[in-house]
Structures are given as C-alpha cells and as structure tokens.
C-alpha cells in the first residue's frame, strides 16, 4: 500500500539506453580533454627536465596498468556504483593536489587522475556490456564518439588557454566537469549492474582472470586491435608535433592537425551508417588497412614534410573510425559471467600502448630518422588488418 504514493519514475527505474551511456562517456571526455594538454606543461614546469618527465609518464603508465588489473578484485568487496564514484573522486583529488603548486605533488596528482580514468573506464564498459544488447554495441560506440567530439576538439586548446590566464583554472574546470559526471551517474541509478554468477565462485586473485583471458583467442585478438589502434594515436599525438618542429613547420602545425583530427569525430554518424551495412570484420579491416597505408605514405614526407602531415591527418580519419568499431570484437566475445573482469583486461590497452610505443620508437630512432617511426606504426596497423581477416565473416551482422 505504501508504494501507491511513490511516483512511478521512482518505483520503476528506466532501463538505460545507448544515449545515456554516451552522455557519461562525453562528460568523462570533458574532464580528460581539458587536462590532456595541461599535464605535460605543468609536469615540465614542476620537474624542469624532459627526461625526468618521460620517466614519470612511464612509471605512471605501469601504475595505471596495475590499478586496472586490481579493479575487479576490489569489486568483490566494493559495489560497482561505489567503485565508479571512487573514480570520480580521484578526478577531484588529483586536480586538487595539482592546484597546490607543490612540485612534488604534481606527479602524484597525475597518477591519481590516471587511476580515476582507468576505474571509470572499466566500470562503464562493464555497465555497457550489462545493459546494451550486442546488436546495439556499434551504435553505442558511434554515439560515444559523436558526443565526445566537441570536448576533444575544444578541450586541449581551452585547457592551455585557461592555464595561461591562471594556472589552477583548467583544474577547477575539470573538477566541475567531474562533479557533473558524478551527478549524472547517480541520476541514472545503475546500481551494481546485472549480477550473473557461476556455479562456483571465481578465483579471487587478478591472475586468475588473466589466465581465462589467455585461453580465449577472440578476446586476445580484440585486445590487440585496441592496443595497436592506441599505438597509432600515440605516434600521431606525440611524434607528429616533433616531426613538424624538426622539419621547420613550426610548433603550431602539430596542434592544429590534432584539433582537426578530433573534429573528425563529428562524422561518426556517417561512419556508423556505413558500418551498419557491413560486418565487423570488413569494418575493422578497412580501418587498419587505410590507416596503415597512410602511415607508410607519411614516411615519404622525410623529403617533403607537408606530405607527411597530410598523410598522417588522413590516417587519423581511419583511427577515429577504429575508435568506433575496433572495440566491437572484444565486447562481443565477452562471456556474461566475466564482464567485470574482462572489462579490466580491455582497459589495459591504453597503458600497454603507452609503454610499448615509446619503447619501439626509441629502438627505431637508433637506426632511422623520425619518419621510420611512422613506417613501424604503419607496419603494425597492417599486421592488425591481417589479424582481423581471421574474425568470423558474419560477426556483427544482424540476424
């Protein structure tokens, strides 16, 4: 009888759709995009040595990787909604420490922010796999990219501009976005997701689900697609600006190219319509082949630098396309009872690519000019295209 006086929208929680999750992803992107170009500058000001900054990035990458692998273990004791809220809290604590102006606090602040990113990414992917049907995953990825496009186009330039006005300003703005992210998450009332249990409880240590991951070739292939795609973005974001400076094109050229590449996210609805008429295998192959060939073409730019810039910018179109469809093979292969654990494994692609890319680039630069890094990246992308050819030919096709 008491329920009679409770509003319907409070008694019956609406099932979240792809658009609601896309909004969450877009608000998370607003936090990260505001600070993505600020952290390197603040880190360099605090540490005063590029080599020390590189070492900090390397160590933070390892810490973030370990954090991601421990999230499912912690999730056995902490409800998922509180794990997500904890990630949002790290988005507040990290920038808060950076605003103190203490040089020793900056690396720690960056590490906490990265831990927040990893935690939120894992929880969000677990929720998506709980509530979104396999047939709607591609639409969900398209909407996430489209909703995040404005943040990634404006955020990097806005963050640096605000920092020049007053150094704490971009951190304050990012904290405001984080508060809004937490508020939207709680209004969605996702709870702890759908609880699907096995007959026997899984092993409590993180190595157990790594072994399960290693026994599933489809998951390994899907994870490799994410790692190699992320390596392509690493080369584009880090080494294109360096190439432009060495080639005499100026410091602004690389930044302009990155902003224009992020604006390509606005084309994700068009990409999605193309994807709807193709299978996942063909879409993933197309993305890797296009990006790989254009990265190889950029190696010719050693003699004519504008060619390299143009080829790499064109390759970023295919990288954006892969952001939309490259994760589908993994998401479609995950067993319902392993969603939380495999979401943690999947999230490690960012940290692994952040460790692998600088290492390979360092080895290449010992024997070749900077354009050799583009060639190595192109070869890796084409290798991923060959691997994509082994996907099921009807994966993602509507039945």
Regions found by a protein language model. Give the residues of each.
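Helix-to-loop junctions at the C-terminal end of transmembrane segments
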Residues: 67-79, 163, 268-280, 365
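Intracellular juxtamembrane helix-capping segments at the cytosolic ends
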Residues: 39, 119-132, 321-334
